[in-house]
Amino acid sequence: MIALVDYGGGNLKSVANAIHALGYEFKLTSSPEEILSAEAVILPGVGAAADTMAGLQSKGLDKAIKELVARDIPLLAICVGMQVLFDYTAEGDNTKCLGILKGDVKRLPEGLKIPQMGWNQLKQRVSHPIFEGIPDGIDFYFVHSYYASPADPGIIGATTDYGVDFCSLVISKRLIATQFHPEKSGSYGLKLYQNFFKMALGDKK
């Protein structure tokens, strides 16, 4: 089962449409038990990190997400879903986050149009199955004002330049996290979802 985490926010409809377009079944859930019994989990994200953390904590989903990563259950985290995996974010009043990944989340540099909203290039830093069939340098769709700064550069799977060369994709064991929105990124965004599901589920749908 694929679990799509419902914490009271996030880009649920477009993510759900992307999953359906690929022919996969999923369950929209806010149950920690269902999330921990899933074969793959998607943590979507739109909006403020503090609101996301409050939504997760109110349903006990913060602990469930920490546990699923500890169990090495495949997780795909998107946009704010990626940011809250780190220790804290500069958004708001240095909001404390999940601390699954070491590092913090910084604001994009002043002097640029913020938020970054639109297409930007993904520069692949490693060879990995998540990039299968996706040429290096393809544009993906971004909407964000903050970016993750991992303490361990070894988890940086791709970077993007917007005044600063920032981490736009994380790979850590079976955890994949993207600053961009694959569900809004056309055929290559769908391909990234497909690659994640293939890594998690094999040929099963």
UniProtKB/Swiss-Prot annotation:
Cellular component annotations (GO), alphabetically ordered: cytoplasm
Entry keywords, A to Z: Amino-acid biosynthesis, Cytoplasm, Glutamine amidotransferase, Histidine biosynthesis, Hydrolase, Lyase
Residue ranges constituting the Glutamine amidotransferase type-1 domain according to the UniProt record: 1-205
Annotated EC: 4.3.2.10, 3.5.1.2
Active site, UniProt feature: 79, 181, 183
Protein's cellular compartments: Cytoplasm
Gene Ontology biological process terms in this record: L-histidine biosynthetic process
Reactions catalysed, as given in the entry: 5-[(5-phospho-1-deoxy-D-ribulos-1-ylimino)methylamino]-1-(5-phospho-beta-D-ribosyl)imidazole-4-carboxamide + L-glutamine = D-erythro-1-(imidazol-4-yl)glycerol 3-phosphate + 5-amino-1-(5-phospho-beta-D-ribosyl)imidazole-4-carboxamide + L-glutamate + H(+); L-glutamine + H2O = L-glutamate + NH4(+)
GO MF annotations in UniProt: glutaminase activity; imidazoleglycerol-phosphate synthase activity; lyase activity
Pathway annotation from the record: Amino-acid biosynthesis; L-histidine biosynthesis; L-histidine from 5-phospho-alpha-D-ribose 1-diphosphate: step 5/9
InterPro entries hit by this protein: Class_I_gatase-like, GATASE, Imidazole-glycPsynth_HisH
Major localisation: cytoplasm
Classification via Pfam families: GATase
SUBUNIT field: Heterodimer of HisH and HisF.
Alphabetized PANTHER family for the sequence: IMIDAZOLE GLYCEROL PHOSPHATE SYNTHASE SUBUNIT HISH
Function: IGPS catalyzes the conversion of PRFAR and glutamine to IGP, AICAR and glutamate. The HisH subunit catalyzes the hydrolysis of glutamine to glutamate and ammonia as part of the synthesis of IGP and AICAR. The resulting ammonia molecule is channeled to the active site of HisF.
Name of the protein this chain belongs to: Imidazole glycerol phosphate synthase subunit HisH
Organism for this UniProt entry: Dehalococcoides mccartyi (strain ATCC BAA-2266 / KCTC 15142 / 195)
Lineage: Bacteria, Bacillati, Chloroflexota, Dehalococcoidia, Dehalococcoidales
Underlying gene: hisH
